[in-house]
């Protein structure tokens, strides 16, 4: 952080978010220990979508640097100014990506978690080449096969992973899922881990405020936590 950045948040907001981050990080450490895993290899993505600027600035002032947004336009409206002050800031796109927003996403985000179709893969490959910029990519798998939810279907996941690697030359790092709200998340986390393992993928983006501890025990390397941090 540069000396010129002054967070626009009241002391109570700062104290609350500092405390929440401490609690979440402690739970991550305990879940990692319970799962015989290294907590330092698990990334906490603070989901800042729809959060007001004072709460985001409180998280920044508390030392957090990894954030997730659902919409490209929302990120474009507020993150450039923070990029100027925080060189180690990492932005993750965790919401569905329209192909016509791909260029803006590549320019704004460090990691894209929601690659799920050939047309988007082709667009990202072209943009990476054109802009000379590589971004970390996760493939979203619709583990619950929900019609209203984005993500490649499980039966198509292996073929899509292979196509992204061989046909499009994309740097596929791992897989992402959002389990159905009305089902236990554990089986979906385990299912995603199984798909990743057989495809030689080490990263798993899974787990949110209500279930990130379970996700860590089942192999999550990135958890997406919003309300447990921001309230």
Segments predicted by a language model, with ranges:
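Gly/Pro- and small hydrophobic-enriched strand-loop and loop-to-helix capping segments
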Residues: 113, 220-231
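Conserved alpha/beta-domain cores
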Residues: 2-203, 208-210, 216-218
């Amino acid at each position: 952080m540069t000396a010129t950045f002054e967070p626009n948040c009241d002391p109570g907001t700062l104290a609350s978010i500092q405390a929440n981050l401490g609690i979440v990080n402690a739970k991550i450490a305990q879940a990692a220990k319970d799962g015989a895993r290294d907590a330092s290899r698990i990334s906490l993505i603070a989901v800042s979508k729809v959060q007001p600027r004072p709460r985001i600035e409180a998280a920044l002032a508390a030392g957090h640097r990894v954030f997730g947004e659902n919409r490209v336009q929302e990120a474009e409206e507020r993150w450039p100014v923070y990029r100027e002050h925080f060189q180690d800031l990492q932005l993750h796109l965790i919401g569905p990506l329209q192909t016509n927003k791909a260029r803006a996403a590549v320019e704004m985000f460090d990691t894209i978690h929601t690659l799920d179709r050939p047309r988007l893969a082709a667009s990202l490959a072209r943009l990476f080449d054109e802009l000379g910029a590589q971004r970390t990519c996760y493939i979203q798998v619709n583990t619950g096969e929900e019609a209203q939810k984005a993500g490649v279907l499980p039966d198509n996941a292996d073929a899509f992973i292979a196509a992204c690697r061989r046909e499009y030359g994309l740097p596929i790092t791992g897989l992402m899922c959002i389990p159905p709200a009305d089902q236990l998340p554990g089986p979906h986390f385990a299912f995603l881990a199984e798909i990743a393992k057989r495809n030689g993928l080490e990263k798993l983006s899974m787990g949110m405020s209500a279930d990130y501890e379970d996700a860590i025990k089942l192999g999550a390397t990135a958890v997406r936590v919003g309300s447990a941090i921001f309230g």
